[in-house]
Each structure stands twice: as structure tokens, then as C-alpha cells.
Amino acid sequence: MFEIQTKTLLKFQKKPTIIYVKNQYYGRNGTMFQVNDVIIYGSQGVCEITAIEEKSISGAKKMYFVLNPIRDQGSTIYAPTDNAAVLKKMRRLLTVPEIHALIDAMPDEKTVWIDNVNERREYYKTLLAGGDPAALIQMIKTLYIHKKEREADGKRLHVMDENFFKDAEQILYHEFEYVLKLPGKDALMAYILERIGS
């Protein structure tokens, strides 16, 4: 009942907003986030919401999501709950069927190469920050093919592109490994290759 009312209210808001009710937040698209949820938070990847609490940071009291990245459990992220950009980076984990659909589509995924280094850098930074899995797959495939082409010419991948390649793999593969309950990248790669029949 309340979730439907919240979505209706949000539909008529001019600015993206969230509503807080008893340790639960409804994002601008109606997605509910609460303590103990495991989510994706942009380039930080898989995180657990360990608390939603008021803190005074830089002299201002605000409510924050307290996030612990699964791959770096020694770190803590404080993400303000009233920030639309923060909510845009937060999403639910993919389901197993959704991951299977992404894997099955990999062979047909188109690649998009940007020759201008500065434009490519900004584009890839945006993709990493957004954490959209389909966009990350396209980025990984594009860089992988470009890497193979350069190796065939006796050249190496540009350092910037190599770093983007590794970062995209880490974000995407960690989510896949977590959801599919696989022990690491090697197991995931074997899983992907078996699924697409390579």
C-alpha cells in the first residue's frame, strides 16, 4: 500500500527525490533500499547497506546510506540519501536469468570504438560510474578486440585503455561471481565460455 502511494507521489515531483520511512528509502523510480540489502553502487560494485543513519559531515547533519563494499570490506562509504546522483548509482543486483541473458547476448554485442583519446576517456569514465552491465559488456568487448588487433601488429594496448578494461571487468565480473556463487574470475570465464558454446 505505502509503496504504491510513494511511487504516485514521486511521479508528480519536479525534482528527483526520495522518501524515508522506518529505515527504508524509496528511490525516484520506486526502488526501495533498506539495511542489509546487497546492491550495486556505481564503480564500487557490490556493496551491502549496513546502516541508514544521520551523521554530521562537514558541519551539516544529513541521513546517509552506510555502504560496505564486498570486495574491500575494510572500507566504508557514506552516501547521502538526499542526493539524486547517489540514487542513480544504486541499483539492485542482477538476477541469475538476467545474467544469463547478458551472457547469451555477448557474441552479438556490437563494439563502439572512439578514436579521440579524450572523448574515449570521458565516455569510459561515464560508463564505469554508471555501472550499467550491458554498457560494461560492450566496453569490455570493444577493448578486448582492440587489444587483440594491436597485439597482432606487435603493439600493446594504451595504458589508459588497459586500466579501463580491468576496471570494467572487475565491476561486471564481481557482480556475476557474487550472484552466480562462483569462486573467482577463472570459474566465471569457464562458465561464460560453456554457456555461449565456445
Task: State each model region's role.
Residues 6-31:
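Short, Lys/Arg-enriched N-terminal segments with co-localized hydrophobic residues
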Residues 82-198:
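Charge/polar-rich, low-complexity and marginally structured segments
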Residues 26-28, 40, 164:
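Low-complexity, compositionally biased segments
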